[in-house]
Amino acid sequence: MKKEKILLYVVLFPVFFQIITYYGFQSSYYNYRDEVRPTEWYYKGIYGYRLLSREIVDMMTLFLERIFTHDFPLREYAMKKGTPYYHSLFLFNTFFAVLTSLMVNSILKRKEYFPEINEKMRLGIVFFLAAISGFSQYVIVHYDNSAIFLLLLGFYFTLNYYRNRQFRDLIILSFVILISTLNRETSCLNISFLAALFFAEIPKSKEGFLNAVKVLFLPVLAFLLPYFVLRLIIPQNAGDEYYFFESITLKYNLTGINQIAGWLFGLLLLKFVYFYALPENRKSITRFLVISLPYILMIFLVGILWEIRLFVPLIYSAVMLAFLKMEKPYFATISQKPYFQKYK
């Protein structure tokens, strides 16, 4: 793909979607534009564990506040459009929106995995996913776009490991999952993606099953370690706002009109991906969704499903699986080798 096409369709599309979302529309969901600092709930309950991107945005906010004390050509215009914190959210999320589109393009252009994806299809998928991400940001948070980028980065190294059986790819994938877990629990979907590939055929032998467990061991450990360490060092207290057991939203999600509309929209998007998926890949998407049931159940249990951003990671994952072509399932040809050796 020529550089000008990457600039126009892969970089500028997400930038314009972000500009339209943040400055063309004002969310009726919450008055983000006038927020001077992150609201208190980002430091409490389950939100308090998503600290990586929050700390970066806090530092960006302090930096912009210093800049706003000086005169510069766009200062008056920028102050009318939002606070330094709001502009920090825009810059941070736009940066990762661009990286996400670049990563989607980078993955889909690999012919060894996506031989049936041509340039026009690839650009169309980049456009579709960028539009869905931008559209979902009537709820603006600091961790969604970065979480999607890290999820895709994990997919990249998952595919590398699936094909080459190089232990270094598994190590890098596990490191990405560890970092991603400090940002948002979406990182667990990397494990679901890996498992969906490696369990393309259920291993018939005990040894084959143990090999599968070995493959998943490091990524699962990379998720569980930061997940539980964060909960040990940042405990939740009963009575606090957004305390896990006091913020169950399941009944609300099943009865509220907006919430029903939210999860029906998510189901419609998944149905849309199924419609365009290669027929032989629909089972892989279903397998991924079944393995991802803990994530899906959790967003129904404590999420607010009117926030369709909760379904976006599932959509990205399903799209990657929809067009993926691998030569042979792993367990169809595996000889009983340690999982850290290159498969030949």
Residue ranges and their predicted role:
Residues D169-E185, N190-A196, L221:
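Membrane-interface alpha helices of multi-pass inner-membrane proteins
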Residues N105-L108, E112, N118-F135:
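Transmembrane and membrane-interface helices of multi-pass
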Residues M1-Q18:
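Start-transfer (signal-anchor) and selected internal transmembrane alpha helices
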Residues M79, T83, H87-F114:
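Transmembrane-helix motifs of polytopic, lipid-linked glycan transferases
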